[in-house]
Structure formats: structure tokens, C-alpha cells
Swiss-Prot record:
Function: The insulin-like growth factors possess growth-promoting activity. Major fetal growth hormone in mammals. Plays a key role in regulating fetoplacental development. IGF2 is influenced by placental lactogen. Also involved in tissue differentiation. In adults, involved in glucose metabolism in adipose tissue, skeletal muscle and liver. Acts as a ligand for integrin which is required for IGF2 signaling. Positively regulates myogenic transcription factor MYOD1 function by facilitating the recruitment of transcriptional coactivators, thereby controlling muscle terminal differentiation.
Note: The IGF2 locus is imprinted. Paternal inherited gene is expressed, while the maternal inherited gene is imprinted, hence silenced.
Subunit structure: Interacts with MYORG; this interaction is required for IGF2 secretion. Interacts with integrins ITGAV:ITGB3 and ITGA6:ITGB4; integrin-binding is required for IGF2 signaling. Interacts with IGFBP2.
Protein name: Insulin-like growth factor 2
Length: 179
């Protein structure tokens, strides 16, 4: 009793399907840095906002911030969601509570950790701090401009030619025609 070719192909296809599923489940996730990290956190967390480091209740001594975890190591959805802020109480929850605040207490916004303006500022801060190659590009541009200026100064003409045409401004030719 031998194994037929059809059965061996079927077993091979089943093995390949299983192997591809396992590879997809355990492959390393992508890394996220800078603006991509902030955009992804904004998408994942939505209106809740997010933290760059975990809230103090979850901190242990060896914990790293999201930049260290997602930029230098692989990052997945479950890890990103741990950095989302907890939503503030809804109006229904607040109205059901029995505590009443005095009128003279100044109201501070609660639960708005990284809304758009602050998120945009932190994105700009990240972009200012991270990419050194942009600073290098700007330095190269300035160096090229400086070199062009030096070239222009070193290649000055020996005789300074007038910028205006003497015939149109009544130079020597107009005196000769009037004589």
C-alpha cells in the first residue's frame, strides 16, 4: 500500500497552509518611529488620547516608554493599546454621582491628554528631535549657498560694465548727432 500522488499533494498543501498561518501569527511586527508612531497611536486610541509613557499605576522599574518599545523593537496592536488613555467619565456617570463641587473651583479639562493641538506639538517636537539627517541636509544646502557666494566673489569681471545702454540714456551718441 503506497501513498498516492493525490494524497501526498493534499498533505503538502495542508502543511503549507498551516505553516503560512503560523508564520503570519508569529512573524515580527513592524517598528514605528516619529510621526508614524504618533499617527498610529492617534488612530488606535481615537478620542481617548494616549501617553508616551504608561500611567504611574502600571509602571515597574524596568518599563520603557512607547518610543523605546515600538521604535527599537517590534510593536503590535495590543502594545499600542496599553498606551491609550482611559476615557473620562461620561455625562451620565457624572450626573449619577452624589458629589457636588463648590462654584469657586476652577474647572480644568479632564481626560483630554493629547488632543489635536497638543498632539501636533508633540509630533513637531518628535520631528525636531529625531531626524539628524534633516539637519545635515540643511547644512549641505547652506554650504552650497556659501560656496556659490564665494564663487561669485572670486569670479568678478576685470572691468565693470555699465548696466544701462548709453544710446537709450543720451550718452556720447546724442552729442555727436546734435553737432
Amino acid at each position: 500500500m503506497g501513498i498516492t500522488a493525490g494524497k501526498s499533494v493534499l498533505v503538502l498543501l495542508a502543511f503549507l497552509a498551516f505553516a503560512s498561518c503560523c508564520y503570519a501569527a508569529y512573524r515580527p511586527s513592524e517598528t514605528l518611529c516619529g510621526g508614524e508612531l504618533v499617527d498610529t497611536l492617534q488612530f488606535v486610541c481615537g478620542d481617548r488620547g494616549f501617553y508616551f509613557s504608561r500611567p504611574s499605576s502600571r509602571i515597574n522599574r524596568r518599563s520603557r516608554g512607547i518610543v523605546e518599545e515600538c521604535c527599537f523593537r517590534s510593536c503590535d496592536l495590543a502594545l499600542l493599546e496599553t498606551y491609550c488613555a482611559t476615557p473620562a467619565k461620561s455625562e451620565r456617570d457624572v450626573s449619577a454621582s452624589t458629589t457636588v463641587l463648590p462654584d469657586d473651583v476652577t474647572a480644568y479639562p479632564v481626560g483630554k491628554f493629547f488632543q489635536y493641538d497638543i498632539w501636533k506639538q508633540s509630533t513637531q517636537r518628535l520631528r525636531r528631535g529625531l531626524p539628524a539627517f534633516l539637519r545635515a541636509r540643511r547644512g549641505r544646502t547652506l554650504a552650497k549657498e556659501l560656496e556659490a557666494l564665494r564663487e561669485a566673489k572670486s569670479h568678478r569681471p576685470l572691468i565693470a560694465l555699465p548696466t544701462q545702454d548709453p544710446a537709450t540714456h543720451g550718452g556720447a551718441s546724442s552729442k555727436a548727432s546734435s553737432d
